[in-house]
């Protein structure tokens, strides 16, 4: 079963962007390659229960088991040693990526309190977009009673776009609610 957002991309977004940027080939049109969802544990790195709950939450939100990221070197100021878990990360591609993006754009982002759109300044200069989410409760899959602490996450959307303008056009057509 193909995802709704993938169908919309190939049927409406590709022809629109091809005309807007005067591409000669359909493969020049920017597309989303992958979405990475990252959560740093911070002070919870000493707590094994916080690590397990973070893994479970990210698996529920993304539909894929996260990888535990570990410290590369010891930092005494942060009380971490080499090899200690410092975060969890998921890389989504193809069908799961489109499913996650669809849920993020149409369900999760509108549930943010006092939501007026996301900032358009978070592009990296190469057409990739990053956004931070302050609480995991905006996702409908998360049960309010089952969370021990409100934690945020970082979401990076990596595209084949060459410029920020192309990346913004792609994400706007996909329905990303940028602030005016």
UniProtKB/Swiss-Prot annotation:
Protein name: Large ribosomal subunit protein uL5
Organism per entry: Gloeothece citriformis (strain PCC 7424)
GO biological process: translation
Family per record: Belongs to the universal ribosomal protein uL5 family.
GO cellular component: ribonucleoprotein complex; ribosome
Keyword hit for ATP-binding: no
InterPro entries from the UniProt entry: Ribosomal_uL5, Ribosomal_uL5_bac-type, Ribosomal_uL5_C, Ribosomal_uL5_CS, Ribosomal_uL5_dom_sf, Ribosomal_uL5_N
PROSITE patterns the UniProt entry points to: RIBOSOMAL_L5 (PS00358)
Keyword terms of this UniProt record: Ribonucleoprotein, Ribosomal protein, RNA-binding, rRNA-binding, tRNA-binding
């Amino acid at each position: 079963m193909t995802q709704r957002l993938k169908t919309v991309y190939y049927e409406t977004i590709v022809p629109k962007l091809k005309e807007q940027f005067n591409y000669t080939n359909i493969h020049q049109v920017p597309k989303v390659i992958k979405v990475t969802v990252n959560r740093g544990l911070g002070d919870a790195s000493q707590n094994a229960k916080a690590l397990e709950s973070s893994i479970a939450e990210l698996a529920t939100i993304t539909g894929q088991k996260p990888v535990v990221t570990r410290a590369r070197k010891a930092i005494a100021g942060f009380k971490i040693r080499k090899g200690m878990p410092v975060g969890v990360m998921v890389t989504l591609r193809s069908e799961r990526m489109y499913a996650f993006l669809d849920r993020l754009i149409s369900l999760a982002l509108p549930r943010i309190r006092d939501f007026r759109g996301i900032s358009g300044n978070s592009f990296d200069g190469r057409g990739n977009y990053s956004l931070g989410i302050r609480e995991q409760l905006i996702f409908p899959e998360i049960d309010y009673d089952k969370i021990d602490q409100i934690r945020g996450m970082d979401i990076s959307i990596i595209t084949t776009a060459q410029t920020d303008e192309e990346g913004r056009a792609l994400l706007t057509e996909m329905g990303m609610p940028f602030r005016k």
